[in-house]
Design a protein with these regions (language model features):
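Extracytosolic ligand-binding ectodomains
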Residues: 1-241
């Protein structure tokens, strides 16, 4: 299996063979986000909201640990229920706490609605979302006026950081009719890694590789793709994430 967006550390910490991750891990993403909040945004107090799922809860747990080391005051770490649409209970808690920022760990449907509802409540705290919010749907759900000034972590480089990536983004939009985002890019990269692994296994086996041969090929695969070079450590994590 090759995953494009599974950031929970347990994905590659279980010793599974044939498991590769092209994106970053929670224990890299969340501390980097906390550092950004402290050093770039100048935040002193922050309210954490998670979706009570493996991804969101893991992000907030790692963020909280890093934030405390940096001297950020975490005023709360509250959960919301995935697939719900009314977050008034936690929004009221945020309003009462009046933090410098709100950090959301989870995916974009709930994260976008949370942003809309805290702005509708008149809360002006800076909004920072995890990589699960990295999609154009944030603007569609939260509203353009609410998305302005919001931050979220992106797994992918900036689209205009290279001509190759920008060309891919343009082709993706022309072909699919959808706006490219971090999900699209890293699922493409995951497919590229999987196909290269299969191709290498087929070549090595003379046409019909066994499962074990495919797993072996995955362990040594190296791919030059649109966002850079993909190589993996003994756990299956991307060395360049």
């Amino acid at each position: 299996m090759v995953t494009g967006q599974s950031t929970n550390v347990d994905v590659t910490e279980r010793g599974l063979k044939g498991m590769l991750r092209v994106c970053q891990r929670d224990d890299f993403e969340a501390p980097a986000t906390a550092k950004f909040c402290k050093e770039t945004l100048g935040i002193g107090t922050i309210f954490l909201v998670n979706d009570q799922q493996a991804f969101g809860a893991g992000q907030c747990e790692a963020f909280e640990a890093a934030a405390k080391e940096l001297g950020l005051e975490v005023v709360a770490n509250e959960g919301i229920v995935s697939n719900e649409v009314d977050f008034s209970a936690v929004v009221n808690q945020i309003a009462a706490a009046n933090p410098d920022a709100v950090y959301y760990g989870g995916n974009y449907p709930e994260g976008s609605l949370l942003l809309k509802q805290i702005r509708d409540k008149g809360i002006t705290s800076i909004y920072v979302g995890s990589s699960g919010v990295d999609t154009a749907e944030l603007v569609n759900i939260a509203g353009k006026e609410n998305a302005v000034g919001a931050y979220y972590i992106s797994s992918s480089p900036a689209f205009d950081s290279s001509a190759v990536l920008q060309e891919w983004v343009d082709r993706y939009q022309q072909t699919s009719g959808l706006a490219a985002d971090g999900y699209a890019i890293y699922f493409y990269e995951a497919a590229a890694v999987a196909l290269e692994s299969l191709s290498n296994a087929i070549d090595a086996a003379g046409g019909k590789p066994t499962r074990a041969q495919v797993v072996e090929a995955m362990a040594g695969v190296q791919v030059e793709s649109i966002t850079g070079t993909f190589q993996f450590d003994e756990k299956g994590d991307n060395r360049n994430a």
